[in-house]
Amino acid sequence: MTTNEETIEVSSLKWFYREAKPLGRSDKLPVLLLHGIPSQSYSWTEVMPALADKGYPSIAPDWIGFGLSAKPDRRDFAYTPDAFIQALTEFIETLELERFSLVVQGFLGSVGIQYALRHPEKIERLAIVGAPVSPEAKLPWKLQQLGLPFLGDMLTQDPLLVDRTLEGGSCYNLSDADLDVYRRPFLKSSDAGRSLLATVRNLQLTEIGAEITSGLKQWQQPTLIVWGMKDPWLPVSCAEQLKAEMPNAELVTIEEAGHYPQEHWSEKVSDVLIGFLRR
């Protein structure tokens, strides 16, 4: 099963996305996979074929400002949660996704959850993979410093920050081939660093967390919470607290995984997601 690479222009912004389709016809709803910071849709490339093999088409975009998607100037794109939500809404409308299951991960996963809460009619099922889900969630220092005056401007222009951040969060080394993909946007243009800087500075986790906490208490769609027990940035207590507030949600922990479970434990993540989608 191959994963295709596509681009589409939405409101003058180029979106890059990956798409995996089952062989033959399938009546299953698509799965939309959203990545975190400073990751890319590439992080889902081992999961997508597994979904397709079981009949689930999947789409994984690079957020605006990340990967191979457009990296507009801050004067043209605010890099706030609302700006990301609006851009995502238009992307989904352009692809004519009427209803789908949503999988979110990491520190942009919160924006994906906000989208779901604001558009529940679109969401069949919701899976939350190691994302900030409460007002108490804080960016780890490794990410906080990327938004600091002067220091952040320098750090976000260093392609090796990808190595330090992804490996620091996952607690494992990534292969050189994988790191080459993640570094490439930073080597190609300074725009990648500027977009990352703007995103970190405008993430508004406290405000987002309040909206998420309130909204998920009323959430009706089936929900899966997946957490890496070795996540150094978002402890499993965050997931346990969310589960306590959502009695109908399912919590699955992965003993060996850190903040980016789909990177090193893609087979386990795939199995958990497929089991959830089938129920």
Describe the role of every protein-language-model region.
Residues 192-244, 253:
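Conserved serine/cysteine hydrolase catalytic core
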Residues 1-14:
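N-terminal cap/lid segment of alpha/beta-hydrolase-fold proteins
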Residues 117, 124-156:
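Flexible "cap/lid" loop of the alpha/beta hydrolase fold
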Residues 249-279:
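Catalytic active-site module of serine/aspartate enzymes centered on a nucleophile-bearing elbow/loop
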Residues 105-114:
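Glycine-rich nucleophile elbow surrounding the catalytic serine of serine-hydrolase chemistry
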Residues 139, 156-217:
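Conserved alpha/beta-hydrolase catalytic His-Asp/Glu region
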Residues 20-68:
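Conserved HGGG/HGGXW glycine-rich cap/lid loop of the alpha/beta-hydrolase fold
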Residues 11, 18-21, 53, 60-104, ...:
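Active-site loop/oxyanion-hole signature of alpha/beta-hydrolase fold enzymes
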